[in-house]
Every structure is written in structure tokens, then in C-alpha cells.
């Protein structure tokens, strides 16, 4: 009698996330990805429960929610402070300036800050990676190995959005060769998000709840979004004019521009204030 081989549950989880990632970034229109994030998170959570994982295994046990809330609020404060410091330092400020948020209206920005970032991105991704995927890997592996694998997969999760949104971040101007700059951006983003994934996993295991990493994740993305929006808007402001009065041309033909100042067409548009396209991804933003 032959032994029937079963597919490891973690392989199912990885396959579902890979298909989801390709569908979001290569097939579906942009507004659909937020809803699909939540659907996939709910679906994989249901799959894990059906496979025998308890709410505590998945970090969704309500008995640990208050502990996760306390740990998450502390981590969120530290994370937001780190983002604010990075946006304030001249050496790292260009990485936060994203021209896609320049023309985003207040209504759309409010949607990103109230729904898209904290719920459809941070909460959904924490349920997927630090909830379901971490539990699936921990069934047959040590916690350290499970954290390593899920963190690397979290870094890979951000490869496609980094490629798609590379043109939106002025940091690309720091590298002359566009293809080399894109590769460096992918490597840097994958490494940084993998590191963040390890930190989120530590919070999840320490607090026994996905609430803690979800709050820290949301704090990073929301503060980065706000910083990018502020930097782009400040960078795109028109410099103030002097109130000394216009200079007349010798023939009396009207005001003449001052030397060194723009002519009637007005000042050139700032490099950091290009057209925005909604949610951010490769730089500071909800992806």
C-alpha cells in the first residue's frame, strides 16, 4: 500500500501569497488590491483554522489582544519617531520624498490614512505573514527558522511594488544608470522589509498577538506617508517674492523681470512635486 503524500500547509500558504502578489501587481486594477488583501488574509486564516491551528497559534486570540495593544503602542511610538528622524535628516530625506503624493487630495489622503494603510495593508499583511504563515512554518520548524523564512518572504513580497513605483521616488536620481538604480532599490527594499518582518515577528511572538506588529506596521507606513506628503508639498512651493515693486523697462513697456528671476512663465516646477498617483509603494507608503 503506497503512502499518500500531503502538501505541507506552509507550501500552500506561500503559493497563495505568490499568486496574490502577481494578481495585484500584474493583473488587477489598483483599487482592487486593498479588497483582495483582506479577502486573502481572511481566506488563509480560515484555511489555517481548518488545518487545526488554534486562534492562539495564529495570534488572533482575544485573550492576548490587550497585551498586543500595549506592546504595539510602544513599538508604534518608537517606529514613528524613527521615521520622523529619517525624514528630518538631509542624508535620508530624499528617500521619503515621493512625487506621487503631490497631487493627492485630502479625501484620498484620508482614505489612505484611515483605511488603506492601517487595515488593508498593515492588518492584512500581519494576519498573512505574522499570523498564518508564521504559524504554518512553526509547526515543523523552530521559531527562529520560522521567523527567518517568513521575513525573507516578506522582503520578496515587496519586490514587484518596488519595481512598479521606482519612478515615483526622487532617490532614483542618486544613481545615473536606471537599471542599476532599480536593482539597488529592489535589494535595499527587500533587505529593509525583511528586517522589518523579523522585528514584527518578534513583536508577535513576544506579545502572542498580531495586534502588536499590526500597530507598529501601520505606524511606520502612516508616518512615512505623511512625511512624504509634507516633503513633496514643501519642496514644490513657490519661493516668496520681494515686495520692492516692479522694475520698468526703459521704453515704458511694462514690468521687466529682475535679473536671475524667472520670467512671465513663473518659476520652474520642483523636481519633488511631480504628479501623484494615489497610494505609495516603492518609497514611503502603504505598500
Question: What is each PLM-predicted segment?
Answer:
Residues 110-237:
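Transmembrane helix-loop-helix hairpins at the membrane interface
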Residues 45, 76-80, 155, 201:
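Hydrophobic alpha-helical segments of integral membrane proteins
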Residues 28, 51-52, 90-91, 158, ...:
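Short helix-capping/hinge motifs at transmembrane helix termini and TM-loop junctions
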Residues 17-24, 44-51, 83-87, 158, ...:
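Structural signal for membrane-spanning alpha-helices in multi-pass inner-membrane proteins
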Residues 237-287:
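Compositionally biased, low-complexity flexible segments
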Residues 3-55, 66-75, 103-107, 112:
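Alpha-helical transmembrane segments in multi-pass membrane proteins
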Residues 1-3, 287:
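Terminal accessory regions that mediate trafficking to/through membranes and regulate activation
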Residues 55-122, 138-139, 172-180, 234:
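Juxtamembrane helix-loop-helix connectors linking adjacent transmembrane helices
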